[in-house]
Amino acid sequence: MQIRSFQLSDYRSVAELLEEVLSEECCEETMGAFARQLSWDSELVLVAEKEGEIVGVLIGTIDQSKGYVYRIAVQEAFRMQGVGRSLISTMNNRFRQRKVMKVLIAEDKHNELLRPFYDSLGLKPSDFVNPTQPLSIVAG
């Protein structure tokens, strides 16, 4: 499996993955944030590729000097195989390269089900934030 930056040729595969994995409402919100993040800094959109297939995606952003994991999605058939963990690890490295000192999980009603996954990574309650103001990639 390879974790790499999103490329324009990945767009259809990523959109299909998000539609498959996320609820309709969540997918709509995520696609808007995804497009904005791509226009601002595509290096913070990562894909997990296995045998030429996109099996996971992570959308990160930097907002007010903090790094945020906004959305992570992994194909169901590839869950519990380290895909999400690898995406998070690679994003944390990207944040470190940019001198981001605090990395947070942007928590919203759509990713509450991921809490056990994040707990398995050793994250603490202080690593989660439900911003009172929407992140720039969400607010537009």
Residue ranges of model-derived segments:
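Active-site rim helix/loop that mediates acceptor-substrate recognition in acyltransferases
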Residues: 25-47, 59
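Conserved beta-strand in the GNAT
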Residues: 47, 53-61, 68-70
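A short beta-loop-alpha structural element at the N-terminal edge
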Residues: 1-14
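Conserved acetyl-CoA-binding loop-helix of GNAT-fold acetyltransferases
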Residues: 80-93, 120
